[in-house]
């Protein structure tokens, strides 16, 4: 399939830059009502008015007919490789159980750990590919995939190897940025020995994953009852010393100092942040840490939404992601994520577009190559079925994507 494409008559709407956009700059979008984009060998080589020749040998020509052309969506926080499902826990939550109380009675993450350890490589890979196909139809062209449902050497490596295998497929629909999340929970084998488990991750897992080049980033669940701030600092500093980008699940359940730690370490991102303090928000803004907000999780858990408006007004770079996982948020719905962010977190449409494209890319350390429609970046696009980008939150929870284009290849026509 050719990776040479010329898109004409497109209403181009895109953030610009090779780093995250912060604060007021999140509202600044390039807007070309009738533009052309040229992609050569999968890379954007021209963006501008309809002034170049549309007839070029070896290029497919796509007439956008005035519809909105956006950068491909970047879902920068998912847990897409896992065994089993947990529908019963969803019902327990409806009946009043909390996320942490379910974990304390042996459910939650540990439930999925057991199922993931038992599942075969092919079973897990097939399920992940199904999720990716579904997400691609909603405009996702790059996704983050975390491990963290193994909590032992072999299963963590299995999860990461599955994502590597998908990335090596030449006709893949979505690129996966892999994140090692061995510190997702304390495995049963290490009950009461959390320091020893952190040492195992530092001394055995990180060097092995680094040598095998199985992950780009390292994450930890920094939360009361899971891993402490000091344990998180120790693991992430070790990861940084090996060249990993660092990320944190931070301040989701209680205000715990995770955002402050992310600022101290100058991490790529701090995620969740439902309970982030004012000082934590300030630390994120001052240290250029992307605040990755996950409105679907707050929606599912019936928790207050993260203070997206406050974060942007404080100078933060905010990203949006789905948090697809089998427990707290069994959804990869980009349309609903977009709507909830605008309705409940009070993001403008322009801010939400930036959050789910360029800032999502920055949260993965990839803003230099994806996240905006600019020469030199990958030819990843979303073509909407309308000329008005405001359709994204207005068409609440419904898919407004007409075409998904990956590296110049047209993947889906909805």
From Swiss-Prot:
It comes from the Bacteria. GO terms for molecular function: imidazolonepropionase activity; iron ion binding; zinc ion binding. SUPFAM superfamilies: Composite domain of metallo-dependent hydrolases, Metallo-dependent hydrolases. Zn(2+) binds at residues 77, 79, 249, 323. It is found in: Cytoplasm. It holds the Pfam family Amidohydro_1. Disulfide bonds: none annotated. Pathway: Amino-acid degradation; L-histidine degradation into L-glutamate; N-formimidoyl-L-glutamate from L-histidine: step 3/3. Catalyzes the hydrolytic cleavage of the carbon-nitrogen bond in imidazolone-5-propanoate to yield N-formimidoyl-L-glutamate. It is the third step in the universal histidine degradation pathway. This is Imidazolonepropionase.
